[in-house]
Amino acid sequence: FCLSRGLGDVYKRQFPHRETPDQTRAIIDVKADMERPAPMDRLISGDVGFGKTEVALRAAFKCVLGGRQVAILAPTTVLAQQHFESFKERLARWPVSVELLSGYRTAKQKADVRARAAAGTVDIVVGTHALLSDGTSFGKLGLVIIDEEHRFGVRHKERLKQLRTEVDVLAM
């Protein structure tokens, strides 16, 4: 995932807050990991409200502009909705499609998101454990972002372990 420095700088300037030193270091490290040939498997830790989502947003932005898709996995429907809204708002100025796959969607909406994910025509899909089901696939998955991985069950963790050998994984 190589990203034009110019686009990355423009996106960075749109961040409405000043980055903390730890945030800056984490963003640099994640971007460097994503440019290595081996899949990234990185954990970003920190207290609630200290900017982990912005680190994830920067990684997602880099992935999408590199022509790949992002799956954002949350343990609850409420948290998935929050991430969906954050990513949608933060990426609104860019040609990036963000969709939600959760219990808040109708069966028809879920089927549409799954079809678009499989075809590679949606850039970012935020969802719950449904993202790990057999009925969900991605045409060109490049990054999986996992929030609160410790809250997922054994079966889901096995699927996540498999993904770690195939695509970049960022856990928070």
Where are these regions (language model features)?
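Walker A/P-loop
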Residues: 38-59, 70-74
